[in-house]
Amino acid sequence: MDAAVDDRMEVGAAEEGFAAWWEDSTEEVSDRTCTVKGKLPDWLVGRLVRNGPGQWRSGDGSRSYSHAFDGLAKLVCFDVAADGVVRFSTRFLRTEWHRQMANGKMPPSVTVGPVTPAWNPVEGLTAALTGPDFDNAPVNIHRLGSSDRWVAVTDAPAMIEFDPRTLETRGRLDANATPIAGSTRWFGQVSLVASDRL
């Protein structure tokens, strides 16, 4: 276990199971049937899709992130059928960030928390001035207006469109190009979306 994982675990050491939050979860599955203990309520039918961090270390294991918003974005889905069968799927968002991490590199970039080991001064300057465009979106998901388009978001301008059925990545959208009328978008956009529609 590396130092960054040790540091993250100290924060929640009193909470049983908290350490698992900081472990890489690189397996992707599609429609795996879950074992249900007990009985689900009859009204519980539908699909729940969320996202969050799924990988903390670079593919070659040389560096790791230390903040929840920096972990590599991974979608998860629970699909509850009318007959009570529950299926689970999970898939990483296929972004430039993901491609670089999968190829063994952690791209020098501005992050929410420090990386372990820390960037050297040249890497830090490179990250601040010319680092790759941040397209990792592990914070939230939402639907664009009343369309059938869904995106994963973070506080950076890039939103990653995905198929809510297959969890496949459809591509990148910039906040300024979305059909959310009357909004000024820039790097400080908020990933916690509010709506006045139910």
Task: Describe the predicted segments one by one.
Residues 1-198:
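Beta-propeller domains
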